[in-house]
Amino acid sequence: MPKFRHLLEKHNIGEKIFTDIRDRLEESGLLMHGGTIVDATIISAPSSTKNRTGTRDPEMHQTKKGNQWYHGMKVHAVVDAGTGYIHTIEGMAANVHDSTEATKLIREDDHVVYGDSGYLGVPKQEDVIKDEHLSQIDYRICKRPSSLKTSKDYEGINWEKQMENRISSIRCKVEHAFLIVKRDFGYRKVAYRGIAKNMNRFHVLFGCANLLMCIRAGRTEQFRNKQVAPMAG
């Protein structure tokens, strides 16, 4: 089995499986364009040195989220804002800030991008400001909760908070993809040393997550036939 896995990794079979599933969704009309949701999740790695080499994985790093420290890698999942299907994933060390990788994950025809407060700095990045496409995108990024507070005696509607709730209701689609991989598939910790080896598996897992979402939505017939059923009415 290890030899077979190494063969899959060598030829990037995991990524090819993910790409094939995504392309089939697109050809079936089940994957839309124009809007993208970006998010990242931390996948824990053993911090122990109790292994064959007696050392930690040099590609895994520590990062702080809230008041808690994590050791491992980070996976960015980028989903279609219209359907929730995953169109891109990217892996990196856990200590890489979300905003530094965001622009690499945006499609050429995206004109709206949703994200949490970790991506607040994206519109201000120099490469975004100077890029003809990236600078024209509408970045709908959730603000930090602390910036939405009103005085205790304020009796009106907090419209800013209402807008944030609206953005969050769209952005939560990406959480569904992570939920499938972590809860349904049980992949909460890295299985191998090195980001590339783990990403080979993540490509397969997120590809399967797309299939599962397609099945749950009752769209398997369209997926198999690569065509969308005519709309009623």
Predicted regions and their residues:
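Membrane-helix cytosolic exit motif
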Residues: 208-220
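Extended hydrophobic-aromatic, low-complexity segments
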Residues: 101, 150-151, 217
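Polybasic low-complexity intrinsically disordered regions
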Residues: 1-133, 144, 203-210
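Helix-centered, glycine/charged polyanion-binding patches within enzymatic domains
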Residues: 111-112, 117-200
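A short, flexible helix-boundary coil/loop motif
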Residues: 217-233
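Intrinsic disorder/low-complexity segments
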Residues: 178, 191-192, 210, 230-233
